[in-house]
């Protein structure tokens, strides 16, 4: 009899709970930024759930105006376009923050770049122009750690395609530098 009472009580609780109003918790929209370039605009949707430290770091540089009047300084068609760290005369901008911990193990596919030190990311970023799965996280060795993905292009892929096709050459010690600078006029948050 005791077990029947418990079962009836459990059913009553379940039924009663089903009458409570359901509260909708719509997910907050993902943050977006507009990269205004000399060749057009690119909108990137960021993923703070998968790469919170990387997104926070990137947005710090965005909001501080760090990227204003920098360039895409390395362009390799079939691979990526890299920017955010040099001015049009190829002077490297000084980073104001410490590198962030690499969040490459987040399950996203590669859209960002780093050196052989897995925790060296500061302000520079790149946008893949091909499926570069060899850059994805494989293990926690320097060569296998991968590159943290923190966003994706949602508008302006045609601009990315135009940038990846520019003529490039050498500039001092740098390779794959656009012969005509591709200016990042600004990067700003958008709704």
Regions found by a protein language model. Give the residues of each.
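Cyclophilin-like peptidyl-prolyl cis-trans isomerases
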Residues: 2-7, 14-191
């Amino acid at each position: 009899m005791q077990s029947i009472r418990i079962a009836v009580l459990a059913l009553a609780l379940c039924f009663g709970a089903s009458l409570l109003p359901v509260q909708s918790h719509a997910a907050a929209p993902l943050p977006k930024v507009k990269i205004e370039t000399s060749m057009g605009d690119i909108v990137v949707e960021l993923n703070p759930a998968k790469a919170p430290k990387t997104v926070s770091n990137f947005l710090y540089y965005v909001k501080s105006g760090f990227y204003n009047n920098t360039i895409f300084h390395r362009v390799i068609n079939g691979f990526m376009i890299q920017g955010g760290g040099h001015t049009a005369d190829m002077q490297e901008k000084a980073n104001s923050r410490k590198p962030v911990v690499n969040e490459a193990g987040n399950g996203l596919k590669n859209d960002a770049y780093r050196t052989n030190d897995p925790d060296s990311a500061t302000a520079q970023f790149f946008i893949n122009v091909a499926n570069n799965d060899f850059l994805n996280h494989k293990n926690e060795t320097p060569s296998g750690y991968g590159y943290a993905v923190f966003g994706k292009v949602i508008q302006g892929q045609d601009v990315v395609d135009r940038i990846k096709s520019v003529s490039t050459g050498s500039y001092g010690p740098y390779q794959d530098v656009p012969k005509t600078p591709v200016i990042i006029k600004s990067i700003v948050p958008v709704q």
